[in-house]
């Protein structure tokens, strides 16, 4: 079986504010961003990889989630964090952008195990809604 991660849904309170954070601070390209701004899309997304996006959905949208998934308690079911792997140069540049935008790096580590083996360095920080992101690089 060939499986790929298609998308994640992140609950946010202000979609435009979150879109700005993920585009301008993190540096991820928007998907359907203009259509959302024009009222032609229910939610914006940002592209993580060629095959994976992060949907930015409002808490209000969670009301219909249990009905569509058929899983009791699935609306807003919490995750601990999600992790993005980048190159060393992008990692260093992101640290600068986070500081410029007043985003506190709340945790860090070295030699941390992940999907590609042992990451040289890793950092954790919250998005505007408190969703925790980890960013790391592998050498």
Which residue stretches match the model-derived regions?
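Core segments of cupin and vicinal oxygen chelate
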Residues: 2, 10-54, 58-61
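Vicinal oxygen chelate
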Residues: 4-13, 44-48, 68-139
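A short, local hydrophobic-aromatic micro-motif
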Residues: 6, 29-31, 54, 80, ...
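A short, acidic/glycine-rich surface segment
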Residues: 32, 63-70, 108, 112, ...
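Glycine-centered loop/turn positions within well-structured domains
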Residues: 52-54, 89, 131
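Short, charged, solvent-exposed linker or helix-capping segments at domain edges/interfaces
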Residues: 57, 66-69, 96, 134
